[in-house]
Amino acid sequence: MNTHIYADIITIGDEILYGQITDTNSQWISAELDKLGIKTRRKSSVSDKADEILQMLREASQRSSIVILTGGLGPTNDDITKKTLCTYFKTELVWNDAVLAHLENLFFIRGRVMNALNKEQALIPSNCEVLTNRHGTAPGMWFDVNGVVYISLPGVPFEMKGILSDVGFDKLKHRFQTPHIIHRVIKTSGVGETTLAELIADWEAALPPYMGLAYLPSAGEVKLRLTGSGDNLEQLQAEIQQQVDSVLPSIEKYVYGFDADTLEYTVGQLLKKQNKTIATAESCTGGYLAHLLTSVAGASAYYSGSVVAYQNKIKTDFLDVPAEVLSKYGAVSEETVKIMAAEVRKKFGASIGVSASGIAGPDGGTEEKPVGTIWIAYADESKVVTLKLQLSNIRENNIRMTALAILNLVRRQLKEVK
């Protein structure tokens, strides 16, 4: 079994280089290849010029055993990929009866007349194997030359994905006898990457050689991605789960979910399970917390509503924060968020009220309260819990990190995690 299989991905098109469209093809392809145990060595974008495409092909074939191209297979004059591949492989375009029959049937079903340009999509390099495109007109093409597999695909994302999902990935798996790859993601919040690494250092050091751990930090959370590879899928799945089970006791209070779980989903499930409701009072987050909570289907079962109290007048008029509290302590204070959380809970008749007030940035800070100073609060029928955050001067990150910090505070209170 070859454990070192590498791929190059080449996206073709002036529109990519000019920033007119975003290349999402290479991102998706590399993620899917990773699931097969194939590592992407390089991603490249190139213009619709034959000499540049040829240079890319020569370079890619020297470092990778798989070269995947997307784009340039359409019927217009600037679609030159097929002709360029003929130059590269020293071959010529020939008519393919199966592709032509597919085109004729497709145009008949759509009630359209096939013109000469459309028909030319049935011209393909003589040395390729056709990868049927059930989703459009341009066929995919597979070349296996001198130990390197080249796959040429349409640039239209849903057509490219369709061809690879229908036939391409299976052919790659068979051709290279790739191992099974399993990823398990442990999602944490409320803990930094370095602290997490210290907590699990012994466990990580003891991982077997066919498993690896990646730390994936982002605003408000750190993901731990455990990856294993092997020939026996069931055995590998069991061993991955054993490793997850063995590390959880060390970090359990920070773990909110696995794989596709989100913090807002986890909190929603806890609220539903405990038959509780929540209301939100937001200042610096401007409704982002409400957005996260309501992005989960079925949130009406536990989400009562929100007050976005951006101005002090709204804090006073709608949340009964006394003017003297605002005058003495300021909007960004423990005293203010405590009242906001308690009052929003009371006004909406919810089990829980939460709040946030702070200086999201990039300006507005003072020496006493610099940019990134944020207070959050949690209130239920028996207590009010507050937490001070000291974040950065990046507004978007501060808004998201504050909302996630509130959700994590709710999670820990509901699970009674200290």
UniProtKB/Swiss-Prot annotation:
CDD domains found in the cross-reference section: cinA (cd00885)
Coiled coil segments of this chain: none
Record-linked InterPro entries: CinA, CinA-like_C, CinA_C, CinA_KH, Competence-induced_CinA, MoaB/Mog-like_dom_sf, MoaB/Mog_dom
Domain of life: Bacteria
Xref: Pfam families: CinA, CinA_KH, MoCF_biosynth
NCBIfam families attached to this UniProt entry: cinA_nterm, PncC_domain, PRK00549.1
Family note: Belongs to the CinA family.
Protein's name according to its UniProt entry: CinA-like protein
Source organism per UniProt: Cytophaga hutchinsonii (strain ATCC 33406 / DSM 1761 / CIP 103989 / NBRC 15051 / NCIMB 9469 / D465)
